[in-house]
Swiss-Prot record:
Belongs to the MurB family. Its EC number is 1.3.1.98. Keywords: Cell cycle, Cell division, Cell shape, Cell wall biogenesis/degradation, Cytoplasm, FAD, Flavoprotein, NADP, Oxidoreductase, Peptidoglycan synthesis. It comes from the Bacteria. GO terms for biological process: cell division; cell wall organization; peptidoglycan biosynthetic process; regulation of cell shape. PANTHER family: UDP-N-ACETYLENOLPYRUVOYLGLUCOSAMINE REDUCTASE. It is an enzyme of class 1 (oxidoreductase). The keyword Cytoplasm applies. This is UDP-N-acetylenolpyruvoylglucosamine reductase. It holds the Pfam family MurB_C. HAMAP family: MurB. It catalyses: UDP-N-acetyl-alpha-D-muramate + NADP(+) = UDP-N-acetyl-3-O-(1-carboxyvinyl)-alpha-D-glucosamine + NADPH + H(+). Its cofactor is FAD.
Amino acid sequence: MTVQWQEQVSLKPYNTFGIDVKARYFSQVQDDQQVRQALGQAQQRGLPVLVIGGGSNLLLTRDIDALVLHMASRGRRVLSDDGERIVVEAEAGEPWHAFVQWTLAQGYCGLENLSLIPGTVGAAPMQNVGAYGVEIKDVFAGLTALDRETGELRDFSLAECAFGYRDSLFKRNPGRWLILRVRFALTRTLHAHLDYGPVRQRLSERGVTELTAQAISDAICSIRREKLPDPAELGNAGSFFKNPVVTADLVERIRAQYPGVVAYPQADGQVKLAAGWLIEQAGWKGHREGDAGVHRLQSLVLVNYGQASGAQMHALARKIQADIFERFGVELEMEPNLY
């Protein structure tokens, strides 16, 4: 099918902050052929291209003078199954949570801790998405991406993706690789990760006696729904700042003034701090400037109460960053990509 272009399209429905900016050109693509076609046409016109999925990791601060390519590919399949280990593949445009629930319905374990994360399958490896003690890299079996410089398809192994904390080769090389489909190694046996956050407590509260991947998923969904606002009701991009990793010396200096600092020692001797705790201690929780604000229940989440612009959201984020650095000597890094 020939790819269709539209002009001056509002991106409000395509980003979870609900920021109303316009794309000069916009196209939805549903398969590899349409992706190549759209990229080729953009190259002929000398147009830059911005690829988006669920729009849950974007902060749009201006109109986009480019072709915005919306990945709308769908499909999921089992590639191999030896009775215990199952490799499944999903197209980049598959909604992430729906894909996770599909794997659980098949009796496959591994993705349950990553339930209810907004976005699409293709975006998950970009950030090495993680939650409740599990990251994409822990269940990753490979992906296929298009090299936008050469037009060639390439398969990536776990090592080649160079995953880090909310980081990957693809995030460090924006615009180079377009992820088309991702593969995951799942199991029939449950290997439960229950020690991060209140997961174990929530399972107990829900009266779970038989531990299953679906029960863990349900518990995590209930926790997330309590803590995180639904983007359909209140514009947001989930956690807005990464948890900073700092030196042990800095943590001790902070602890001298704030004995309750939330800190997680890392294997390399550094320490990960809870960004939400820092922001809350600094008094930003529930803060609002016009329609840009910090969520009243979760200080790690910036929210758009309706009419905030991307520039206003960014200005608020910059104020928070400056204040946290002044108070604690800690630099907060934004998670969403800024355009």
